[in-house]
UniProtKB/Swiss-Prot annotation:
Coiled coil: none annotated. It comes from Nitratiruptor sp. (strain SB155-2). Binds directly to 16S ribosomal RNA. One of its GO terms (biological process) is translation. This is Small ribosomal subunit protein bS20. InterPro entries: Ribosomal_bS20, Ribosomal_bS20_sf.
Length: 90
């Protein structure tokens, strides 16, 4: 265990940040799952609405430093591709 005062503070900060990041990452996974479920159900309006929410949240998490910009772009692109595949299938 850390002995210096600054090292103890760093341990506390790391725990706090890890917990916060875990919360947002879990939330992001659930939002992505909502989009995939809406696409699977075939409800185009619900899929588009879920995509809007996901897009907003994912970019919000970039500004919070939870994920990196390219990671977010990749996730959003994948979701857009998925929702757009509904248009082609219909």
């Amino acid at each position: 265990m850390a002995n210096h005062k600054s090292a103890l503070k760093r341990v506390r900060q790391t725990k706090k940040r890890t917990e916060r990041n875990r919360f947002y990452r879990t939330r992001m996974k659930n939002i992505i799952k909502d989009v995939k479920e809406a696409v699977a159900s075939g409800n185009k309006a619900a899929a588009i609405e879920a995509l809007k929410v996901a897009n907003k949240r994912i970019h919000e998490y970039v500004s919070k430093g939870i994920i990196k910009k390219n990671n977010a772009a990749r996730k959003v692109s994948k979701l857009h591709k998925l929702v757009n595949s509904m248009n082609e299938a219909a």
